[in-house]
UniProtKB/Swiss-Prot annotation:
Protein disulfide isomerase. Might play a role in the unfolded protein response. May regulate transport of alpha4-beta2 neuronal acetylcholine receptor. Residues 133-175, 287-328 form the EGF-like domain. Residues 1-22 form the signal peptide. GO terms for molecular function: calcium ion binding; protein disulfide isomerase activity. FU repeats lie at residues 190-237, 250-297. This is Protein disulfide isomerase Creld2. Broadly expressed in brain (at protein level). Its main location: endoplasmic reticulum. It is found in: Endoplasmic reticulum. It catalyses: Catalyzes the rearrangement of -S-S- bonds in proteins. Glycans are attached at N187, N248.
Length: 349
């Protein structure tokens, strides 16, 4: 039994989809994280264990501590979690480089990220550059993609430097406006595109009067694009069991109330006609109480009538049974009525 369960469990594991592999950080991301933690460590230890008293002594002692190996060791100990194998591996491989920067290169290369990740490890590029040789992004390193997009591979040794434009912009330098946007300002290096009015497919300005072409669901009336009321069309766009609601640029078909046969709007007050079992009362479809009508709804003798939404139910009372034209009292119930407290005889048992 246990072997069967184990085999079944193993088969289930094989059939289950594999867990999604977590995306590993790139070498540049690992290097940047290490540098960020190093800089944070420097900030945390900047005035450690000094807090008032003999100022001259503090300045002298602090100056020694600032560049000491003790401080470096404290910073290095906080760079990687014990469970982060890749971080610890990188630190072990580059420990001597970090010590060299700390002891003799920090003054000439104050930007640790640039010296360590860009120049030494060649894992990253400076902002605005990309790829193995850290080439400038499209539009230049100062304002890649004219400031209106992202440079593929920006700051890394990856990517192709092409521009991925923000919403509203297009073109190799993200300087042109997409359909639905207009140019507010443009020169050789800068471009500002703003959204057209919702009624415009293309436009030259912000209002519905600036439309060059109307969007679908809108039509030009005089000098502006206005909403088309599809619900007012000669042939309604919705089915007979629905009503039409106009919205800007389109329409919505909503279901009629369950009591309606056709409707002009929401709820039982907007029914064109009522379904069977309902009738118009005070302007809306209401349930007919068939059991209270002058003409009896339940035709069989002794039968009880119960009203339900849109209909009624005919049921024989307790102690009665159905026949074709009446509810007939059962023999057992007749005996009980004649002798309500008399116990059953031995023969009856």
């Amino acid at each position: 039994m246990h072997l069967l369960l184990a085999a079944g469990f193993g088969l289930l594991l094989l059939l289950l989809p594999p867990p999604a592999a977590s995306k590993k950080p790139t070498q540049c991301q690992r290097c940047r994280t290490l540098v960020d933690k190093f800089n944070q460590g420097m900030a945390n230890t900047a005035r450690k264990n000094f807090g008032g008293g003999n100022t001259a002594w503090e300045e002298k002692t602090l100056s020694k501590y600032e560049f000491s190996e003790i401080r470096l060791l404290e910073i290095m100990e906080g760079l990687c979690d014990s469970s982060d194998f890749e971080c610890n591996q990188l630190l072990e491989q580059q420990e001597e480089q970090l010590e060299a920067w700390w002891q003799s290169l920090k003054k000439d290369y104050p930007n640790l990220f640039e010296w360590f990740c860009v120049r030494t490890l060649k894992a990253c590029c400076l902002p605005g550059t990309y790829g193995p040789d850290c080439k400038e992004c499209q539009g230049g390193s100062e304002r890649p993609c004219s400031g209106n997009g992202y440079c593929s591979g920006d700051g890394s040794r990856q990517g192709d430097g092409s521009c991925q434009c923000h919403a509203g912009y297009k073109g190799p330098l993200c300087i042109d406006c997409m359909d639905g946007y207009f140019s507010l300002q443009r020169n050789e290096t800068h471009s500002i595109c703003l959204a057209c009015d919702e009624s415009c497919k293309t436009c030259s300005g912000p209002s519905n009067k600036d439309c060059v072409q109307c969007e679908v669901g809108w039509a030009r009336v005089e000098d502006a694009c206005v909403d088309v009321d599809e619900c007012a069309a000669e042939t309604p766009p919705c089915s007979e069991a629905q009503y039409c609601e106009n919205v800007n640029g389109s329409y919505i078909c909503e279901e009629c109330d369950s009591t309606c046969v056709g409707c002009t709007g929401k709820g039982p007050a907007n029914c064109k006609e009522c379904i069977a079992g309902y009738t118009k009362q005070s302007g809306q479809c209401a349930d007919i109480d068939e059991c209270s009508l002058e003409e009896k709804a339940c035709k069989r003798r002794n039968e009880n009538c119960y009203n339900v939404p849109g209909s009624f139910v005919c049921v024989c009372p307790d102690g009665f049974e159905e026949t074709e034209d009446a509810c007939v009292q059962t023999a057992q119930s007749e005996v009980t009525e004649e002798n309500p407290t008399q116990p059953l005889s031995h023969e009856d048992l």
